[in-house]
Amino acid sequence: MRQYEVMYILKPDLEDEESTQLIEKFSKIITDRDGEITELNRWGKRRLAYEIKDYREGHYVVMKCRAEHAAAQELDRVFRITDGLLRHMIIRED
């Protein structure tokens, strides 16, 4: 298993319940594939460095996990088709 750091920015106009559901959905992708979430930090609403999709703010979430490469690929695929997401990044830590 590899160590990953995942950062994603949710749209600021999502309700708390909707953002919580998305975070649980993304975490479940890792845990369903025998991965482990080691850390999950919700940074809250912050101003973006530049405008993304007509938004100037977003809810930042940082997740550290241990997972197989296939789980990271699936997470990336789901990120790309999720409407409530502004931006995402998956980094493999060495």
UniProtKB/Swiss-Prot annotation:
Belongs to the bacterial ribosomal protein bS6 family. SUPFAM superfamilies: Ribosomal protein S6. GO terms for cellular component: cytoplasm; ribonucleoprotein complex; ribosome. HAMAP family: Ribosomal_bS6. One of its GO terms (biological process) is translation. This is Small ribosomal subunit protein bS6. Pfam families: Ribosomal_S6. It comes from the Bacteria. Binds together with bS18 to 16S ribosomal RNA. Keywords: Ribonucleoprotein, Ribosomal protein, RNA-binding, rRNA-binding. PROSITE patterns: RIBOSOMAL_S6. One of its GO terms (molecular function) is small ribosomal subunit rRNA binding. NCBIfam families: S6 (TIGR00166).
